[in-house]
Amino acid sequence: MNLINEKLNNLENSATKSPKEAVVLLNMGGPNSLYEVGVFLKNMFDDPFILTIKNNFMRKMVGKMIVNSRIEKSKKIYEKLGGKSPLTPITFALTERLNELDPSRFYTYAMRYTPPYASMVLQDLALKEIESLVFFSMYPQYSSTTTLSSFNDAFNALKSLETFRPKVRVIERFYADKKLNEIILNTILSALNNCKSQDFVLIFSVHGLPKSIVDAGDTYQQECEHHVSLLKELMQQKNIPFKEVLLSYQSKLGPMKWLEPSTEELIEKHRKSNIIIYPLAFTIDNSETLYELDMQYRLMAERLAVKEYLVCPCLNDSIEFAKFIIELVKNLKSE
């Protein structure tokens, strides 16, 4: 009887004990309303990792010009998505699932360009008396424009809290993990819905970058290419053939030379084939996946008379992705 009571007490204590480690999922964010579209664009184009103009005054001036030229077009895009970005609510749903699956840690999220900002989230974690943190980049491949920008923002926010000094570890890339790539491959097969893979051209579409950023040493292009090669190897191992497997870059902005080929170019080039697109650089659906790939490019594919045009969803708040995140955190070595 004493043993039963002891076990019940242990269960009760573990249920009420607050986690001392927090995992903060870092992403770019997106407008939570049409009003926030301006906030989102202003913060993005004021980011020195995005607009790499060293002079602060000049960067703000150029950024303001870009925002003014894009704000109305961007609002129309988000109107088509229900008046807001899906990224924040999906990320919230993912953290809810993570906290349910792994109550030993507290999972939350911080956004780079829209609330909740890292400063807000870290203040909350300080009140929770968190002793250790994992900053988890939601970008599978590393780039100064995304990963480094988010980490820089999070660490600056942490430094501003003088009395909050938790142990910090980071997960800055995870594209090479075989378990992730098996989830991606299963997502692609599910989107095919029993169609034969060999009848499709598979395009891995990633967010584009100005070539000048890569020339300055950013490893993003190299990591995207490596990611595609790993997925090709996995397809070969599992005997899942496609007509072709290609990498493309989307979301070009401005007159500068960007990474090529563009997603639009490849859709046009393979217009006589069935096409399936997987958004390889995104883990959570956003305007670039749901509007650009699934609406804008779908219309283009229809004009080109592409017979089958399929777009895979991102990993989002799927239980497979949640379990992958938990395992990655558990296996993270102490620094």
Swiss-Prot record:
It comes from the Bacteria. GO terms for molecular function: ferrochelatase activity; metal ion binding. Its main location: cytoplasm. Its EC number is 4.98.1.1. Fe cation binds at residues 207, 288. InterPro entries: Ferrochelatase, Ferrochelatase_AS, Ferrochelatase_C, Ferrochelatase_N. It is found in: Cytoplasm. GO terms for biological process: heme biosynthetic process. GO terms for cellular component: cytoplasm. Coiled coil: none annotated. It catalyses: heme b + 2 H(+) = protoporphyrin IX + Fe(2+). The keyword Lyase applies. Catalyzes the ferrous insertion into protoporphyrin IX. Belongs to the ferrochelatase family. This is Ferrochelatase. It comes from Helicobacter pylori (strain J99 / ATCC 700824) (Campylobacter pylori J99).
